[in-house]
Amino acid sequence: MQLHFHIIGISLMILALIHIIFPKYFNWKEELKSLSLMNKQMMTIHTFFIALIVFLMGLLCLTSAGELTGTKLGKTVSLGLGIFWAIRLFVQFFGYSSKLWRGKPFETLIHIVFSGFWMYLNGVFWTNYLA
């Protein structure tokens, strides 16, 4: 189980760093032009904090796998992370329109890869909590 936590830790830290390219990749300079200053800043600041918390989740999994798998507190943290990633998996299917990826090879691949990743996270966190 600790190996899974290490894999998750590294993966989440990489995912967090990928957020750095979001403004350029999604062309936020143009796409967000029509938004108010408040909404523009909410997009960028919330993206930063999402990336930060994902990075810190990864760091926790990477550095504290033993505690997460071997203590009552670690199991409780796993429950919280399991709930978080279960909601994220739900949003993957019911929050985003399939129009964003259906019929687009790259976007479909990303949808499938991340759906699988969210399932993997759920499997590990819930299995650890219930063990």
Question: Language-model features: where?
Answer:
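Juxtamembrane helix-entry segments on the extracytoplasmic side of multipass membrane proteins
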Residues: L3-F5, K72-V77
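Core segments of alpha-helical transmembrane spans in multipass integral membrane proteins
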Residues: I10, I14-A16, I21-P23, M38-G66, ...
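Hydrophobic alpha-helical segments at protein termini of multi-pass membrane proteins
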Residues: M38-I45, W101, M119-N122
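Cytosolic juxtamembrane helix and N-cap/initiation of the first transmembrane helix
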Residues: M1-L12
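Juxtamembrane boundary at the C-terminal end of a transmembrane helix
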Residues: N122-A131
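Cytosolic, membrane-interface loops and tails of multi-pass inner-membrane proteins
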Residues: F22-K40, G95-G103
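Interfacial loop-to-transmembrane junctions
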Residues: F94-G116
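Juxtamembrane helix-break-helix junctions at the cytosolic face
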Residues: L59-K75, Y96-L100
